């Protein structure tokens, strides 16, 4: 694709037809893709749609270090943030399932050290997506004229509450109780940094942010 906006639009076209589709880009690329992305939150999906953002804290190879968790909050879509290579695989698989269950695009946030990491990853058997691939005409869902968008806005708010309930039961959000005097809240790679320096502290580890 010529740019990130077009890449996300092509990904959405595949999702509309029922295919599972993923778009991957750097954090600044999401700025370019923000136009269709914000509307995709209203439209929802047919086949699962995942947007992977690779953020760059400390500006290892980028022009800024924006935190794209703000995009997920802005668009009211779920975001998963893996802390190692195994979770990167597992959370991406889960992201497709959540996307189809809740009719929403899902973001997965990597950062520089996750993207450059190596590790042993346990694989599973390939899963055949359950949705047949076919073009569906659904004007009220896929055409965001104001009259339709107002209805979908209400859907987004209802979906947000359902996602909140899911997050509260999600196994990737967990507590590790050790030293009761000090607790650290982490998400993604910060969990690994914390455990390396303070192995005996207690942790709230967030996999869905």
Name each region found by the language model.
Residues 1-101:
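Thiamine diphosphate
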Residues 82-209:
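Flexible, low-complexity linker and terminal segments
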């Amino acid at each position: 694709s010529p740019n990130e906006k077009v890449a996300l639009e092509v990904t959405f076209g595949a999702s509309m037809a029922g295919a599972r589709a993923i778009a991957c880009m750097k954090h600044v690329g999401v700025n370019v893709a923000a136009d269709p992305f914000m509307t995709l939150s209203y439209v929802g999906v047919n086949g699962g749609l995942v947007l992977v953002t690779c953020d760059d804290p400390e500006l290892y190879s980028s022009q800024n270090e924006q935190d794209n968790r703000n995009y997920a909050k802005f668009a009211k879509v779920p975001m998963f943030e893996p802390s190692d290579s195994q979770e990167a695989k597992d959370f991406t698989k889960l992201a497709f399932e959540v996307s189809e269950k809740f009719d929403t695009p899902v973001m997965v946030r990597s950062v520089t050290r996750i993207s450059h990491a190596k590790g042993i990853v346990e694989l599973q058997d390939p899963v055949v997506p359950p949705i047949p691939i076919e073009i569906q005409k659904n004007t009220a869902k896929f055409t965001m004229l104001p009259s339709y968008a107002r209805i979908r806005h209400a859907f987004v708010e209802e979906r947000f509450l359902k996602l909140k309930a899911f997050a509260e039961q999600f196994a990737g959000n967990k507590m590790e109780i050790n030293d009761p005097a000090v607790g650290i809240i982490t998400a993604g790679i910060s969990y690994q940094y914390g455990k390396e320096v303070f192995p005996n502290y207690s942790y709230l580890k967030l996999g869905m942010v």
